[in-house]
Each structure stands twice: as C-alpha cells, then as structure tokens.
Amino acid sequence: MSLRQLLLRLSGYLGASGPPNRHWWYFRSLDTISSVGSWRGRSSRSPAHWNQVVSEAEKIVGYPASFMSLRCLLSDELSNVAMQVRKLVGTQHPLLTTARGFVHDSRHNLQLRGLVVLLISKAAGPSTRNSSSQNYDMVSGIYSCQRNLAEITELIHTALLVHRGIVNLSELQSSDGPLKDMKFGNKIAVLSGDFLLANACNGLALLQNTKVVELLASALMDLVQGIYQENSASTQGNPIPDDIRISTWKEQTFLSHCALLAKSCKAAMELAKHDAAVQDMAFQYGKHMAMSHKINSDLQPFIKDKASDSKTFNLNSAPVVLHQEFLGRDLWIKQIGEAQEKGRLNYTKLRETIKAGKGVTSAIDLCRYHGNKALEALESFPPSEARSALENIVFAVTRFS
C-alpha cells in the first residue's frame, strides 16, 4: 500500500465530519487560515490560492508538508492511541478534529511552520563557516539536521494543538454529550500530546546542539505561558472581555503564536552555522509572518462573505481589541450590553457593530505592517526560488480583496 493510500484510508478511518461549532475553554482560532491572498493583487479570496502557494513551496524544498511528522504519527505507540481515538467517533470531543487534521486538512495547513523552516533554510543556503566536507549532508539545498528541526517544530506545534483540545468538564452542557466520552477524550488528548512532546525532545537531543535545544525549549516555555494567558483572558461565561491594549495583545500573541516559528527559523540558521545577523533576520521573518498570519485568522469572521461560517468570534481578537481601543472601554461595554438578548450575546449584531467601526480596517493595516516587516527581513537573503516562496506566503496572508 502506498503512503498516499495509507493516508486516505486513515482519513476515512477517522471519519469525514467534524464536531459542531462550539466554544470550549480554549480559543478556537488556532492559526486557521482560509480565503486569503495578497494585497498586491485583486484576486478573490480563495483557499485554492493558499493551497497553490503551499504546493509550489513544497516542490522547492522537495518535502511535502503533509508528511512532515508522519514518521512519528504512524509509530507503533501512536497507532495504539489511534485505536483509542476511534472510540471517540460519533462524540463531540474536539480531539477528533485535530486528529483528522493530521491526515488531510488543506484549509488549516497544520504543517506550515515546518515548511517555513525548510524554505528559510534553503533560502539562506550553506554558511561560509561550514567546511566543504559538511555539505555532503545537504539534499535540495537543506541539511538533514534542518529537516529534522522542521519535523521537531511540527511535533511541538501539533502536541500543543492536541493539549488545547482538552475540554473543561465543569462547563459542559447536556448538548455536549455524555460526560464519560469527554473524560475519555481528555485522557487520550493528554497522553497523545505528551507522546508527541517526548518525541520532539528526543529529536532535539539527537541534533547535539545546545543552542538549538535552548532556543526550542524557550519557545515551548513561551507557548505554555501564552496559552495560559489566553485561557485567563477567555470570555467563556463572561461577555465582558479583558481591557487590553493592542500592545499587550501583540505581546501575548508573540508568545502563543509567533515564538515557535521565529525561534525555529533562528535555530535552522544556527544549525547551518550562519552568523548572528542572518539568525536575527530569520527570527524577524518568522516572528512577523506568524503575527500577520494570526491577525489574518482573527479577521476571518469579519471579512468572510458568509456570516454563517463564523457565528461566534473571539472577543479578545485583534479587530475587537482595536475596536475597543478606538471606541473607549465604557462605550465598548455599552455596545456589548446592547447586543445581549435574553442573557446571551448576539454575535451577529455585535459583528456588524464592530465592522462599522475602525477595528477591522486597522487590523488589516496591522496585518500588512507585519507582512512588510517580514518582507524586509527577507531582503538580507540572496534571490532564489525559496526566498520567492517565503515572499508568496506573506502575500497570501496579507491579501484582503
């Protein structure tokens, strides 16, 4: 059986449908990206454009992103976990959605981080500090250790996605299904996420580079801290969001959504023995590209043609934070109160109120600002197909037509 056939069979094994649109204790805006493009063009927003950008990038690095962490995901240990995950089919536990994303999810592109690490590794090329004898290890312009780093980056990201799918049992409703299903799903989420993190740590040790280990360890610490802050700011059960400025939002977003990619890009340069200046430019690209990617995700509920695709949205997302900043705290709380109907928040009404303000357009400008900063960082790399692919990724997450 071919690898592609195996993936398709596993996809059917996990089922085709996802759980209903529902708010758990964690944020549902997990770096999703769809219907995006470049502000420099006038094409309509379409997932096909993003898929084309990713497909062309994969050809350049010679490594399909969808297979990035497949060796780990198809291991004997995780195969046993997959057998247990099958028992969740038919329930509403969010772990199922994440599991299906491992197999095929062109809309969310869970493997974006690893692909970017490979692209920036190829764009930078070998360092002059590397001896010619070390270059034999390169395939398609990328060292094997850099490919391993890309897989490790994906394992860490995937593990955090799995852990973020843990359901807060104290907030369950009768419509969520049996309590025993949610308890069982939580156990599997904890175990499988820990397994992926353990494999990532093992892979880091095998790289035998203490600076890289330190970078990725600090990225993991940032992720945990950022997710904790997000959960603390969650508006579940409380319609009044935190009073935060966009500067605070950016600090929190860097921790939870940007640090892993930024530090992985820097680590890839360290593995190739590039100097500090090149490492910093790689870090800046990863940081600003990830930031624009997150802002694009936050904007989707406000720019999608079909409002039914996003009935709810995060009240601590970039457009909402900017809307509150322009409006003032008191008027914002008043608008939330006016959108209340029978004790529940009418998101459709609140969305239209936010769209009428300056928050959405300001968020688009902020997304483009970080996109431009990412492009500026790329100017330090020599022109190449890999650099062009990195530029196209930025164009794709900053198009709003």
From Swiss-Prot:
Q: In what pathway does it function?
A: Cofactor biosynthesis; ubiquinone biosynthesis
Top-level EC class: transferase
Compartment(s) of residence: Mitochondrion
**What InterPro entries does the entry give?**
Isoprenoid_synthase_dom_sf (IPR008949), Polyprenyl_synt (IPR000092)
Query: Which reaction does this chain catalyze?
Result: 7 isopentenyl diphosphate + (2E,6E)-farnesyl diphosphate = all-trans-decaprenyl diphosphate + 7 diphosphate; 6 isopentenyl diphosphate + (2E,6E)-farnesyl diphosphate = all-trans-nonaprenyl diphosphate + 6 diphosphate
GO terms assigned for molecular function: all-trans-decaprenyl-diphosphate synthase activity; prenyltransferase activity; protein heterodimerization activity
An example of a Gene Ontology cellular component annotation for this protein is: heterotetrameric polyprenyl diphosphate synthase complex
Going by the UniProt record, its keywords in alphabetical order are: Isoprene biosynthesis, Lipid metabolism, Mitochondrion, Transferase, Ubiquinone biosynthesis
UniProt superkingdom: Eukaryota
Pfam families assigned: polyprenyl_synt
Query: One GO BP annotation here?
Result: regulation of body fluid levels
What is this enzyme's EC?
2.5.1.91
Q: How does it assemble?
A: Heterotetramer composed of 2 PDSS1/DPS1 and 2 PDSS2/DLP1 subunits.
Give the function comment from the record. Answer: Heterotetrameric enzyme that catalyzes the condensation of farnesyl diphosphate (FPP), which acts as a primer, and isopentenyl diphosphate (IPP) to produce prenyl diphosphates of varying chain lengths and participates in the determination of the side chain of ubiquinone. Supplies nona and decaprenyl diphosphate, the precursors for the side chain of the isoprenoid quinones ubiquinone-9 (Q9) and ubiquinone-10 (Q10) respectively. The enzyme adds isopentenyl diphosphate molecules sequentially to farnesyl diphosphate with trans stereochemistry. May play a role during cerebellar development.
Family label:
Belongs to the FPP/GGPP synthase family.
Which protein is depicted? All trans-polyprenyl-diphosphate synthase PDSS2
Native organism is Rattus norvegicus
Q: Which gene encodes it?
A: Pdss2
